[in-house]
Amino acid sequence: QMGKMRLTTRFVTAFVGLAALSFGLSVANASLADDAPKTYTWRTAPKHSAGIAPDPVALRETAIVQVYVAPTYGGRRYVAVHPWIIVKKSGETAFTRYDVVGWRAPDVVQRNYALPDGLWYGERPQLLVDHRGEGVDAMIGEIEAAIVSYPYADTYRVYPGPNSNTFLAHIGREVSALKLDLPA
């Protein structure tokens, strides 16, 4: 009688364990299925234009400032983003992009490292800030001064920083007209 009870308990425990394992694997597989099309590596990830930035040639006479953010590459994409800023003064026909890129150390502040609105290693950016027209040329001057005054231009740490978020937070604090409030 006692032996049958132990056998039944073991069987039930094994069955529940297998069911839990099966459920866990199904959940894990389902979460990976959302990423299924993204079978690229950081080397092969698409970095083409997302088609968000306006045509700088068509808007030659308009000063423009935009801030973008995209999920980071790999597993960190669930907890971290990569922001950058693009600027175009009145009369210019191209954007200048500024961001901080850790693997470019010791010169982590990069100018035109990637396309103005390019995918960040396969991730589509989101537009956070868009300023155009009157007063924006002056704002660009302040932004460029903030970039020069960034105190961590040769330092990068994923966590807790300084990193690309620290860079944009610095610019946001220095240029109030930008209306960009990011945590450092």
Q: Which sequence ranges carry the predicted segments?
A:
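Mid-length scaffold segments of soluble, non-membrane domains
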Residues: 107-169
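Activation targets extended, charge/polar-rich intrinsically disordered C-terminal tails
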Residues: 3-50, 145-184
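Residue-identity detector for glycine
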Residues: 3, 17, 24, 51, ...
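Glycine-rich catalytic cores of cysteine/serine-nucleophile enzymes that process amide/ester linkages
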Residues: 33-131
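Solvent-exposed soluble domains appended to multi-pass membrane proteins
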Residues: 80, 87, 99-102, 111, ...
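Weak global preference for isoleucine
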Residues: 52, 64, 85-86, 140-143, ...
